[in-house]
Amino acid sequence: MLMDVFSSFDAHSYNLIWLSMPLWLLSSMVPMTVLFSDVHSKSGSTSSFRSLVLSFTYSMIRLNGKGLKLSGFPLVMSGLFMMILMLNLSGNFPFFFPVSGQFVFGFSFALSIWTCLVLSSLLCSFEQGLMSLVPTGCPLILVPFMVVVELISGMLRPLTLVLRLTLNLGAGKVILTMCSSELVVGWLNSSSLITGVGGIKGLLMGGGVFGAAEVAIACIQCYIFCVLLCLYTEDHSS
């Protein structure tokens, strides 16, 4: 089958897709193991790593919204951050299917967390939840129109969030794939003066740069996804 730069996002182009399943399972189980194991211990690498992850996510939540006031939200975001980060990083390995770059994956988390935040806000204070649909100082005649606009914009939040994650991961992987392919082709077509050990070193250095860029994109997009979910708590009722 003819392969192109978008074939890495097509599950049917992976004849060995079953190799990705252990890594998916590991990416799902590691956050639970790190966050809930060795709870009563105050020493050890697992406890230190858990403290580091929790402190980072707690600071992220504290600076972006009112998530610390919601019971269980920091723990959910800590596990989600670790899982998406590991899946983003695992998608950079050869022959591993990038499941985090799929629309359904991100949409399931974005929709479920956004729905829980909306329901929690309405249950906490139904009046404040409805008042958030009307901007401050809005003329009375425009209230029905603004309510419809706010409802539509609110319901589009999960869609825009997952599109941002999927498109950015996809665009980054496509660009890096094209650049790395051009690098390999250029090295293979180069003259004998720059081949040999020097050419191999240049190829390895170029591959290292592109690999570091892929890791940076995976980390940044995971952080942006979780930060935007935290910002949705700004509209939560007090």
From Swiss-Prot:
Q: Which UniProt keywords apply?
A: ATP synthesis, CF(0), Hydrogen ion transport, Ion transport, Membrane, Mitochondrion, Mitochondrion inner membrane, Transmembrane, Transmembrane helix, Transport
Protein localization: Mitochondrion inner membrane
Write down any Gene Ontology CC term: mitochondrial inner membrane
Q: Which SUPFAM superfamilies match?
A: F1F0 ATP synthase subunit A
Asked if the keyword Transmembrane belongs to this entry, the reply reads yes
Q: Which GO terms describe its molecular function?
A: proton-transporting ATP synthase activity, rotational mechanism
Q: How does it sit in the membrane?
A: Multi-pass membrane protein
Does Transport appear among the keywords? Answer: yes
Q: Which Pfam families match?
A: ATP-synt_A (PF00119)
Q: Where are the transmembrane segments?
A: 16-36, 79-99, 103-123, 129-149, 209-229
Q: Which Gene3D superfamilies does the record associate with it?
A: ATP synthase, F0 complex, subunit A (1.20.120.220)
Q: Which family does it belong to?
A: Belongs to the ATPase A chain family.
Complex and partners: F-type ATPases have 2 components, CF(1) - the catalytic core - and CF(0) - the membrane proton channel. CF(1) has five subunits: alpha(3), beta(3), gamma(1), delta(1), epsilon(1). CF(0) has three main subunits: a, b and c.
Role summary: Mitochondrial membrane ATP synthase (F(1)F(0) ATP synthase or Complex V) produces ATP from ADP in the presence of a proton gradient across the membrane which is generated by electron transport complexes of the respiratory chain. F-type ATPases consist of two structural domains, F(1) - containing the extramembraneous catalytic core and F(0) - containing the membrane proton channel, linked together by a central stalk and a peripheral stalk. During catalysis, ATP synthesis in the catalytic domain of F(1) is coupled via a rotary mechanism of the central stalk subunits to proton translocation.
Name listed for the protein in its UniProt record: ATP synthase subunit a
